[in-house]
Structures are given as C-alpha cells and as structure tokens.
A protein has these predicted regions:
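Alpha-helical transmembrane bundle of multi-pass membrane proteins
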Residues: 1-197, 225-443
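Solenoid-repeat scaffolds in large eukaryotic assemblies
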Residues: 200-204
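Short, well-structured alpha-helical segments
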Residues: 213-225
C-alpha cells in the first residue's frame, strides 16, 4: 500500500507538470493573434513560438545544477517563481522584444521542471508504484494541456482580443504550486548522496516505507559507496553509463519525431488546413486534450502491471498506422476536416498510452543515483532540442512540402521507434532504482 503522504508529495511535485503542459499548449490559441498584433513575418512568428523552447532547452540543460547543489525542492520553488513571472509578464508585455524575452524565461521553467520533478518523484516512490507515481507528472502535463485548450476556448468566447488573458491566467496555478511546495520534504536520496544527512533522509524514508526503510537506506548507501570507488563515477561520459545514456537520447528523440509537439502547438492551424472554421478548430483542439488526458489515465493503471515496454510496443504500432492515414488524407486532397480530427484523436490516444506516459518514468529510472540529475538532463535536453527544431520548422515545412510529406516523415520515424523498442529497450517495472542500476551499467 502506498503511503498517503507519498501520494500527496507526488501530486504536489507533479503540479510542475501541469504548468509545463499549460505553458506548452496555451500559445496554440494565441499564436495567430500574436502574429497579427505585432505584424510578424513567418520567420519572426516561428521564432516567437520556438523561443520558449529555446528557453526550455536551456532550462533542461542547466536544471541538474540547482537540483544537485541546492536540492530538488528548493529548485522547484525557484521554478514556480519563474512560471509566475513568465505568465504575468507575457500578459502585459508592451513590445515584441519584451514578449520574446518573457517567453524565454517561461521556457526556462518548463525545461528545469522536466528534469527535477520526475527525479524527485522517482526518488521517493516505492518500486512497486514508481511508474504510477512518476506518471502523475505526465498526467499533469496533459491535464495542463487540456485546461489550457479549454481556457483558450472559453476566453476566446468572452473577449474580442483574448490572447493576453489566455497567457496571463497561468499565474493562478503558478501561485498555487509555489504555496504547496512548502509542505514537501527534500528527496531522501539527495540528502544521502549530496549532503550525507542520513538522519533527515531516514525520517522521510520511514514515511515512504515503514517496514523496509532500513534496508532501503542500506541499499542507497551501498550504491553510493560502490560509485565512490570509481573516480569518474560522477561523469556521465563514464563508459558504465553508455547504455542508459544511449537509451535516454533515443527515447527522447523518438518522442519528438512522432510529431506530438507540432500537433500540440499548431493544432488549430492543422485543423484549419483540414478545412475547419476557427471556432471549430479551437473546440477540436480541446477534444484532443481530453483524449490525451483519458488515455494517460488509462496508462496509469497499466504501466506497473503490463510494464513500460509493452505500452511502447502497442503505442508504436498505433502511431505508425494513424500518422500514415493522416498523411494519406493530405495526399488524396479533398480533405475532410472531421476525418482528420478523428485520426489525430486516435493518434493522441496511442501517444498518451505509450510515449507520453512512459518517457519521464523511464528516463528517471535508468540512471544510477549519483548521475540521475545529469542523466535526466541529457534526456530532457535531447527532448527539447528536438521539440524546438520541429516547432520552428513545422509551419515552413508544411507550407513548402504540404501536410502529406510532413506526416509521412513522422510515420516513418515511428517505424524506427518500433525497432528500438523491440531490440534495445529494457523492462524496468517492479525493480528498485538500485536493481536497475546493476542491470544497466557496466562494471
């Protein structure tokens, strides 16, 4: 049985995922108005959208530094402030340059939270429930996406020029996150590995695992002592970590070449391309958010029973088929907007059940305690670099090559993902972090 306090701490930390998802998707309802308001060229517009992702890449790359130096909890308090400043600032920005700067600052929070929050949850969760608890982060990402879509739709009905309200409303959950972080303890593994505060760590582990906390303490300390024998143990480039590093890079790469962020960012534009009106496009986008949430909830029930690998195998097959059909509908011409909407909803269902649910769980598990923050940074950095490239290039590519070629590229990439899952991806369900370390690292 999972202790209630562990669930509560995980839910609070997962609110970082809610802000991550809200910030990622809220721009979809405002992006066309922003282009009109500041008379932006396509290149300037692409830069305006992708600058948040550049901030995200930066936040992901440097997120491990505060996570290891001042702790997971204090780092997330700083991130909550960043979200608050970014949301309020973009809502009142008086010129394009300031708006772009504040979008970058908001992106820093998204990137850093994608590194630190999953680490924290994986480090306090018991092995039997780690998948379900870490997936709360992804659940909150898709909940944030859905709420942002719904918020955009409702605000769009209430105001004639709604984009500032769309962006500014995120200040409310940012403030709630900041307040709730006061009630969360520091990660016990961080306390042992970076501060040698064994007594403080023991108090938290006792709340997590009343019967087995002493053995868990012993396992963490033993793993730390083993790593300290290797003078290069803290370097992610140590040959011991080559396999988990490769897994993290490939997993994050395939996550983005599925086309998910292109659809999240540009869903209304895609539906307009498929023939839907503006209001119908926004409402269909909300439907995508609802499907995303529903199938993430379904994955929560199966990730610790079926395992990570089976979810990925099923999802990869579904993504290949749905992306191929979307590509075909664009190739065939005479596009039916409702048909494309249904296909993309099925696509989202397969993505949410597999890649969307598994990525933050899997990457947070596969690295040893000593380099977990660095490993999570590597995976997050790869994820956001690819997201930036796709978000920046998607409007240009669809304009020059059309929807058919664009979605066919995503489909082919999912064929490669299927091979990766089949041939390389290990199963991690039900294993302690120290057991996974012994399996995946070279000694």
């Amino acid at each position: 049985m999972i202790q209630r306090k562990v669930i509560g701490w995980s839910i609070i930390m997962a609110l970082g995922g809610f802000l991550f998802g809200f910030d990622t998707a809220v721009i979809s309802g405002a992006e066309q108005s922003i282009q009109t308001y500041w008379h932006l060229s396509d290149l300037q517009h692409g830069f305006t959208i992708s600058i948040a992702l550049i901030g995200t890449v930066t936040g992901a790359f440097f997120g491990r530094i505060p996570a290891d130096s001042i702790g997971r909890r204090k780092s997330l308090i700083i991130i909550a402030f960043i979200f608050l400043i970014g949301s309020l600032g973009t809502a009142v920005a008086t010129n394009w340059y300031l708006f772009v700067l504040l979008r970058f600052i908001g992106g820093l929070g998204v990137g850093a939270s994608s590194v630190i929050a999953p680490i924290y949850i994986s480090e306090i969760a018991p092995a039997s429930a780690r998948g379900r608890l870490v997936i709360l982060f992804q659940f909150n990402i898709v909940l944030g996406i859905l709420i942002s879509y719904l918020s955009n739709y409702l605000i769009g009905l209430l105001f004639t020029d709604p984009w500032r309200y769309m962006l500014g409303i995120m200040a409310i959950p940012s403030l709630i996150f900041l307040i709730l972080l006061r009630f969360v303890p520091e990660s016990p593994r961080w306390l042992i590995l970076h501060k040698a505060q064994h007594d403080e760590a023991r108090k938290t582990l006792q709340l997590v695992n009343l019967e087995g906390y002493e053995q868990e303490m012993a396992n963490i300390i033993a793993a730390k002592n083993e790593e300290e024998k290797d003078v290069n143990a803290e370097s992610l480039f140590n040959k011991r970590y080559r396999f988990p590093a490769t897994l993290a890079i490939l997993f994050a790469f395939f996550n983005q070449v599925s086309g998910i962020n292109a659809i999240i960012y540009y869903a209304p534009r895609i539906f307009t391309m498929a023939g839907l009106g503006k209001s119908a496009a926004l409402l269909s986008t909300t439907g995508i958010g609802a499907v995303n949430l529903a199938f993430t909830m379904l994955a929560i029930w199966f990730i610790d029973s079926l395992g990570r690998k089976k979810l990925m195998f099923v999802g990869s097959l579904g993504l290949i088929v749905t992306l191929g059909l979307v590509a075909y509908s664009f190739y065939a011409g005479n596009i039916n907007g409702n048909y494309v909407t249904y296909l993309l909803m099925v696509y989202i269902a397969f993505f949410a059940f597999s890649q969307g649910a598994v990525i933050w769980v899997f990457i947070s598990e596969i690295f040893p305690n000593q380099v977990r923050a660095k490993g999570q940074t590597l995976g997050s950095f790869t994820h956001w670099v690819m997201a930036t490239i796709i978000a920046f290039s998607f409007p240009y590519i669809t304009d020059k090559l059309g929807g058919g070629h664009t979605f066919m590229f995503f489909a082919v990439m999912m064929v490669f993902q299927l091979v990766f899952v089949w041939r390389m991806m290990p199963e991690t369900k039900g294993k302690s972090l120290e057991q996974i370390e012994r399996t995946l690292t070279m000694h």
